[in-house]
Amino acid sequence: MAYERFTSAITLLMHWRNRLDPYWKLARGDRPVGFLLLLWPTWWALWLAAGGVPPWWTLCVFTTGIWLTRSAGCVINDYTDRWLDPHVERTRIRPLVTGAVSPRNALLMFATLMLIAFGLVLTMNQLTVLLSVVGLFLAMTYPYLKRYTYLPQVYLGLAFGWGIPMAFAAIQGKVPTQAWLLYVANILWTTAYDTWCAMVDRDDDIKMGAKSTAILFADLDLTVQGVLYTLMLFTLCLVGLRATLSHTYWISLIAAVALIGYQFIIARRREPTACFRAFMHNNWVGMTIFAGIALATTH
């Protein structure tokens, strides 16, 4: 009898696991690097704004909110890309393409995730709540950009970095110049690393009429990325000077230079697999810079 109950419980768990698995994949729960690429810049901002470890509730709200909004962004991105994803090698097995998740359920999932995230934001001050409305607009409009402009990666930077001014607003009640410098650095970084991802899909995107910085930059892609990364690091130097950060921050920037250089080495032939590795490698760049900021602001 006990064995039968145990077997029934396992069967039920497997049933729900199989039912929920497509939704987990739709939210990119199986691919945490995207979450981390959004997390690190927000943590940069939280630690800089607080001058050290931020208040625990603010840290919890932003960390959870990042996961929720990133997941929601992936859902709405796949919903709007239903015309494109079946024709792109990297995306043709996504749940909306295979029919594992219906478009209606995807929209319900997006709305649910955003409502939970907004509920968390409501525990912050008024300025943070107002800024979150802009963040919602950026998240909802980004997926449509690849139809109309070659710069969706720049717009992704605007959306991915919006947690930076929100973090300063939540802790300081204002968004100082330092926050906007950090925001600009993140836009440059996001544009650079997402261009690696766009290079993976470039041939398929050209066939389908989609647009990206990889298509715009063409043979100059590596050169322009080098410029973007250089400008990002220069802007981060301005952030460090303005915040009078200690030597650990500057050491982290030197380490970031080495990590970025490695990306160009592995992707120098523009092979799709190598370009995707370079994209994923940016997680280490973000983590290294965060470590430098955290150590530099520890008293």
Swiss-Prot record:
GO biological process terms, semicolon-separated: ubiquinone biosynthetic process
Bilayer topology annotation: Multi-pass membrane protein
Principal localisation: membrane
Catalyzed chemical reaction(s): all-trans-octaprenyl diphosphate + 4-hydroxybenzoate = 4-hydroxy-3-(all-trans-octaprenyl)benzoate + diphosphate
Necessary cofactors: Mg(2+)
Pathway the protein takes part in: Cofactor biosynthesis; ubiquinone biosynthesis
Keyword tags: Cell inner membrane, Cell membrane, Magnesium, Membrane, Transferase, Transmembrane, Transmembrane helix, Ubiquinone biosynthesis
Compartmental location: Cell inner membrane
Gene3D superfamilies: UbiA prenyltransferase
InterPro entries (alphabetical): HB_polyprenyltransferase-like, Prenyltransferase, UbiA_prenyltransferase, UbiA_prenylTrfase_CS, UbiA_sf
Enzyme Commission code: 2.5.1.39
A GO term, aspect molecular function: 4-hydroxybenzoate polyprenyltransferase activity
GO cellular component: plasma membrane
CDD domains the record matches: PT_UbiA_COQ2 (cd13959)
Record-linked Pfam families: UbiA
Family: Belongs to the UbiA prenyltransferase family.
Function summary: Catalyzes the prenylation of para-hydroxybenzoate (PHB) with an all-trans polyprenyl group. Mediates the second step in the final reaction sequence of ubiquinone-8 (UQ-8) biosynthesis, which is the condensation of the polyisoprenoid side chain with PHB, generating the first membrane-bound Q intermediate 3-octaprenyl-4-hydroxybenzoate.
Protein's recorded name: 4-hydroxybenzoate octaprenyltransferase
